[in-house]
């Protein structure tokens, strides 16, 4: 490579270089300072700070690095501020200093992962936050965030918490008036009353219970504009969805109220998921267009008595993951192909690891009658990268 090619990158405007460096972890961005005098201070113009404790030898070294970066960074606006300390404890005064500095620079996206998290008062009313991820792995400490949250611009909220901090998570959710995407993962909580969340702006919802044996009282979500839903089936009992009164249907036998707006549904496999519960979900989502499911762990196939409305009118794509090629898998797939009238694509991810078994499944399904004449079948597995009918 000639010298002109080498200089082409170095001669770019500082604004362009800072955007490039902002796309990489901050530790790597700082390392570019040794390339030449031209590069020595380019990293100080980054608009994203992304620091993970893992590459450092000890939490104290990582904390010192964060201090140094914030002292030298010249950007007046931080688009992304991400700190990942796993379950390690960071001194409260130090964490408060970092968060306040990010807020001073009008942080847009904030992600924090640590063992014990105490938020400064200034965080509760941040007007620039649009995306927030909080992961608190502490299981022994109880933190009570007393001050109400008011995050007027927050549209994406991702929470991972254990035990009592779940109550704090609920306080946080209620302080986001324009929330569009919510992901909530936690073990369980104790509360005498059911918790009700009215979020008319919500479009995407993901609910995961980390441990199935922990008690969890009922959660009710009033979400009239929901489009995407991802659940593990541990939520069948303690979870309800409601819409505005004009859209609420009577409770069906399924795990959800009938939710006419959902277009994307993803179901994770666990001890509660079975073929019957899958179709209960489908019955609840009449406008469903895209379905992703993992194979139930143990369940005998029982053909539904009626075909869900979404399969007759709207269901366009199906992703079936962890397929073992067993009898119940084949019966389910044949049923979907034979009854989904507007299906365009079904993608099957095989997990058997046996070439002969996977190829037999492929051959059988390619010969299976399809109600939708435009439906294609894609296979993904060790025996083939993909095969499309």
Each model region followed by its residue ranges:
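C-terminal capping region of solenoid repeat domains
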Residues: 1-4, 249-251, 264, 289-292, ...
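Leucine-rich repeat
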Residues: 2-201, 210, 310, ...
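Conserved hydrophobic position(s) of the canonical leucine-rich repeat
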Residues: 46, 78, 107, 129-132, ...
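Short, aliphatic-rich beta-strand segments
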Residues: 49-53, 81, 263-266, 316-320
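A structural signal for leucine-rich repeat
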Residues: 96-101, 121-127, 144-153, 169-178, ...
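Hydrophobic alpha-helix feature that most strongly marks membrane-spanning transmembrane helices
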Residues: 283-286, 293, 320-323, 337, ...
């Amino acid at each position: 490579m000639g010298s002109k090619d080498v200089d082409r990158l170095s001669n770019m405007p500082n604004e362009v270089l800072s955007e490039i460096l902002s796309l990489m972890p901050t530790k790597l961005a700082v390392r570019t300072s040794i390339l030449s005098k031209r590069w020595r201070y380019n990293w100080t113009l980054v608009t994203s700070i992304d620091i993970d404790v893992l590459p450092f030898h000890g939490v104290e070294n990582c904390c010192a690095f964060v201090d140094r970066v914030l002292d030298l960074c010249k950007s007046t606006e931080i688009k992304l501020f991400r700190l990942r300390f796993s379950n390690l404890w960071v001194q409260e005064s130090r964490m408060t200093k970092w968060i306040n500095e990010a807020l001073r620079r009008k942080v847009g996206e904030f992600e924090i992962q640590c063992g014990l998290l105490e938020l400064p008062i200034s965080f509760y009313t941040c007007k620039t936050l649009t995306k927030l991820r909080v992961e608190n792995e502490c299981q022994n400490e109880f933190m009570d965030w007393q001050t109400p949250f008011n995050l007027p611009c927050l549209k994406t909220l991702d929470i991972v918490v254990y035990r009592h901090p779940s109550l704090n998570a609920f306080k946080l959710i209620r302080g986001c008036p324009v929330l569009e995407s919510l992901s909530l993962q936690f073990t369980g909580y104790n509360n005498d009353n059911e918790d009700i969340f009215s979020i008319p702006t919500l479009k995407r919802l993901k609910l995961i219970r980390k441990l199935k044996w922990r008690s969890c009282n009922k959660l009710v979500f009033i979400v009239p504009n929901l489009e995407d839903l991802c659940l593990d089936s541990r939520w069948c009992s303690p979870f309800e969805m409601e819409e505005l009164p004009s859209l609420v249907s009577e409770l069906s036998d399924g795990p959800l109220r009938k939710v006419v707006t959902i277009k994307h549904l993803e179901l994770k496999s666990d001890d509660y998921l079975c073929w019957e519960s899958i179709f209960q979900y489908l019955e609840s989502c009449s406008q469903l267009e895209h379905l992703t499911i993992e194979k139930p762990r143990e369940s005998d196939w029982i053909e539904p008595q009626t075909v869900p409305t979404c399969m007759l009118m709207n269901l366009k794509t199906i992703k079936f993951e962890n397929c073992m090629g067993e009898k119940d898998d084949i019966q389910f797939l044949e049923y979907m192909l034979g009854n989904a009238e507007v299906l365009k694509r079904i993608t099957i991810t095989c997990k058997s690891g046996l070439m002969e078994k996977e190829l037999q499944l492929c051959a059988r399904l390619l010969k299976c009658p399809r109600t939708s004449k435009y439906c294609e079948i894609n296979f993904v597995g060790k025996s083939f990268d993909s095969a499309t009918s």
